[in-house]
From Swiss-Prot:
Polyketide methyltransferase; part of the gene cluster that mediates the biosynthesis of sordarin and hypoxysordarin, glycoside antibiotics with a unique tetracyclic diterpene aglycone structure. First, the geranylgeranyl diphosphate synthase sdnC constructs GGDP from farnesyl diphosphate and isopentenyl diphosphate. The diterpene cyclase sdnA then catalyzes the cyclization of GGDP to afford cycloaraneosene. One of its GO terms (biological process) is antibiotic biosynthetic process. This is Polyketide methyltransferase sdnL. Pathway: Antibiotic biosynthesis. It comes from the Eukaryota. The keyword Transferase applies. GO terms for molecular function: methyltransferase activity.
Length: 413
């Protein structure tokens, strides 16, 4: 168990609200109305137009090659032929959800098959020819073409080049990724530096800097309290803490880093105590799917999380737990992917958290949901207002910073 050094005392009552209307809402609106500025800084713009088509072509090649190795050769099927299922003996049950998704990718991205209108899960071969270019050739031609996206391409190749083995179970994907220092770093770097994830994280840092500044100007009796859920290897943490400390607010905030992994929490504590000794940070184990700890109830001004909350069994339960941890004028700010990308299913589709939604009965048919669904669920959980980042670019619709705000009249149950 990792010892906690949190300065919030059990039973401590939250101080008075900042204003009659939370400043967090206006701060969020002001800084997040134009995603494209952050997108340009992070080099995220033009992704869908310039980069994604190459990624989709590579993903299709990985799937076609894997299916061929597992006994389903699409190129041998004639137009109008029924597309058989992969032989059940070749794919263990735990990968059946991913297989269903890969069939959808073949239909939606490659137009190689078309689903039956009368029978769910049944497909027919179309007249679109299978691209004969080997995945290895496509990968080599893509690597270095868009350097800011290479972390995704390298990680995709780690799994995609062995997709047949990963699907059949002959290759242990967890060992492939986490048992290799380079591959594990690729995954961590993707979450921290991939441009489309980086852009909303930049906006999150801006919002928190302004929020802490506004709070400290009128509240000298208590610090601004931030809780991070599912902080993992600390990619978001690092950016936020650095921005706050560079802005001179190291004494004006408390930051609680949490994760469900004892090892990750212990590692983060060593790392951040060394890198940011001036910051008021504490570290704790926290499973947001479980009933909240008593000492955390109604204690935080802002709760943040990056690509974590969707990976819970029941979003409605999780959002309700988040709400209970907030002060009456608090907010939750989530960086969440709101648009499907076919490569993502290969990169994270073998991780158990990607499919937890199937156990929770919260109405989802996929791990990710769009901003409108987030809004509906947040309001159902008791958040009075829900906002999200906007922009003119297609990239602004892909990974969003979504804010749920409590009104002062909301009572936390």
């Amino acid at each position: 168990m990792v010892p906690r050094t949190i300065s919030i005392k059990p039973g401590q009552q939250p101080g008075p609200p900042l204003t009659s209307e939370s400043h967090l809402t206006s701060t969020f609106q002001e800084l997040c109305s134009n995603y494209d500025t952050a997108g340009k800084t992070a080099k995220a713009l033009d992704y869908w137009k310039e980069v994604y088509p190459f990624q989709a072509r590579l993903v299709l090649a990985y799937i076609v090659e894997a299916f061929t190795a597992l006994g389903l050769e699409l190129s041998k099927l004639q137009t109008g032929d029924s597309v058989p299922e992969l032989p059940s003996a070749t794919v263990p049950k735990e990968h059946h959800q991913l297989i269903r998704r890969l069939y959808q990718v073949l239909e939606q991205e490659g137009k190689l098959i078309i689903s039956s209108e009368s029978s769910e899960g049944c497909y027919t071969r179309t007249n679109i020819p299978v691209d004969p270019t080997p995945s290895s050739t496509l990968y080599r031609s893509l690597l270095g073409r868009f350097p800011q996206h290479d972390v995704v391409h390298e990680l995709l190749n780690v799994i995609g080049s062995q997709l047949a083995g990963c699907l059949s179970g002959s290759v242990d994907v967890l060992h492939l990724v986490f048992g290799n220092v380079k591959n594990k770093k690729l995954l961590n770097d993707m979450y921290e530096f991939w441009p489309l994830l980086r852009a909303p994280t930049l906006l999150l840092g801006d919002v928190l800097v302004k929020a802490v500044g506004a709070h400290s100007s009128v509240n000298t009796n208590r610090p601004f309290r931030i809780l991070e859920i599912g902080a993992g290897t600390g990619g978001t943490t690092r950016h936020v803490i650095q921005r706050l400390c560079e802005s001179g607010f190291q004494a004006q905030f408390e930051y609680v880093f949490t994760d469900i992994s004892t090892a990750l929490v212990a590692s983060a504590k060593r790392q951040f105590k060394k890198s940011f000794p001036q910051a008021r940070m504490s570290f704790d184990l926290l499973d947001i799917e479980q009933p909240p700890k008593m000492e955390y109830l109604s204690q935080f001004d802002v709760i943040i999380s990056t690509n974590c909350i969707h990976a819970t069994k029941n979003l409605d339960n999780t959002l309700g737990n988040l709400r209970k941890l907030l002060r009456t004028d608090g907010a939750v700010m989530l960086v969440e992917t709101t648009q499907k990308m076919c490569w993502l299913d290969i990169v994270v589709g073998f991780f158990g958290g990607w499919w937890l939604f199937e156990e929770g009965g919260d109405g989802r048919d996929y791990a990710l949901i769009d901003e409108e669904d987030w809004s509906e669920r947040m309001k159902k959980a008791g958040f009075g207002e829900v906002l999200w980042t906007e922009g003119k670019s297609e990239e602004s619709k892909t990974v969003r910073l979504i804010g749920g705000f409590l009104g002062l009249g909301d009572v936390v149950n």
